[in-house]
Amino acid sequence: MKREQIEGVAEDLAGKAQSAVGRLVEDPALEAEGDARQAAGQVTKTYGDTLDTVSSFVKEKPFAALAITAAVTLVVSRLLRR
């Protein structure tokens, strides 16, 4: 499990707790801040999941990963020349 995945889950849980406290004390700003932390945590976890997937792919198929990288580089360089 990547560091980003762990951080994302922790931030998500902290956001859920903060939202719950905001609802409990009837503080909409605190609740909204908790919702934002929860969303940020989910994004961070998804980023970590993506890193894990890409890392696994590169380890399993290094030549395919190299070919994909070369193709993307070629396309980007062609687009930037215009």
Swiss-Prot record:
Domain of life: Bacteria
Annotated SUPFAM superfamilies: Hypothetical protein YjbJ
Pfam families documented for this protein: CsbD
Record field: transmembrane: none
Family named by the database record: Belongs to the UPF0337 (CsbD) family.
Protein name: UPF0337 protein PP_2059
Originating species: Pseudomonas putida (strain ATCC 47054 / DSM 6125 / CFBP 8728 / NCIMB 11950 / KT2440)
Taxonomic placement: Bacteria, Pseudomonadati, Pseudomonadota, Gammaproteobacteria, Pseudomonadales
